[in-house]
Amino acid sequence: MSLDIAQIALHQLIKRDEQTLDMVLRDSLLPTNAAVEDMMAELHRVYSAKSKAYGLFNEQSELADALRACRKGDEDFLSFSRAATGRLRDELAKYPFAEGGIVLFCQYRYLAVEYLLISVLNSCNSMRVNEQLDISTTHYLDINHADIIARIDLTEWETNPESTRYLTFLKGRVGRKVSDFFMDFLAASEGLDTKAQNRGLLKAVDEYCDEAQLDKNERQNYRQQVHSYCTEQLQSGEEIELASLSQELPPLGEKTFQQFSADQGYELEESFPADRGTLRQLTKFAGSGGGISLNFDALLLGERIFWDPATDTLTIKGTPPNLRDQLQRRTSGGKQ
């Protein structure tokens, strides 16, 4: 699938000392060539593969106002990106962890959807070997570890301004403060709660099975069907569609799964992104804490694994061979 770049601008923030964050602003847009296209294709791929949070602009968002003006032609894209970089610098300077980076603004189209992607990318040093086998230093953009990224679905924003999901962003691997400053820069708030939607789906499935009075095996088979559908959607980059999921599932009683979900008021969207971690609970039990980490198939509960809620005791009958081998060697006096 091709990614068509409309406009792209690069600027730079440089941290001089603990108090100073300087800007280096380009005077022209970045020419679109093969290298730029490859970079954006990689950034799009990396971003699309990561779990994202959803949001929407606040009513007083300066960035949203400037973007509207840019879209109307009242301001050109370069001027918009330069002014936005200044606002980003001012916001970032409030935080003690502030670091510099390459600030990227790219308007592009992918699969008939128009996007604006904004990112702060780290510039890293590495070594290269030339044809004469000499070693020298080179610089590269660390796209694979980029975690300060937001993307605005311009098509959704302009055709459905009441949407709570036209803006997506990464919360960042180094803590909430990273996403906080970026959300402040965007003047946006969190919108659609993907995890809550997935948890609501699991609750609806369990209560649908309860109402049909399915036995343990029937219930788990039903949960497996839901998991298979959701996993296929996730792997293909598609969202969970309640209507199509309901068509995949055999009705239990007089109501389809979609009708049951609507009647019970789970407040599920017609479609929403799949959350891999939440959906895993359909087929597995997992948990960790106090030096213990457990993960097992749900079907094993009541067969090889038993839980006594009165004493909060888990009994496992038949340990995995590699675990059993370690236990035998340790208890027989072997030092591993």
Swiss-Prot record:
Indicate what this protein is called per its UniProt record.
Nucleoid-associated protein ECA2747
**Primary subcellular site in the record, as a coarse category:** cytoplasm
Task: Report disulfide bridges, numbered on this chain.
Answer: none
Q: Which GO terms describe its molecular function?
A: double-stranded DNA binding; single-stranded RNA binding
Family listed: Belongs to the YejK family.
Q: Which organism is it from?
A: Pectobacterium atrosepticum (strain SCRI 1043 / ATCC BAA-672)
> Which PANTHER family is this protein grouped with?
NUCLEOID-ASSOCIATED PROTEIN YEJK (PTHR38772:SF1), PTHR38772
Keyword Cytoplasm listed: yes
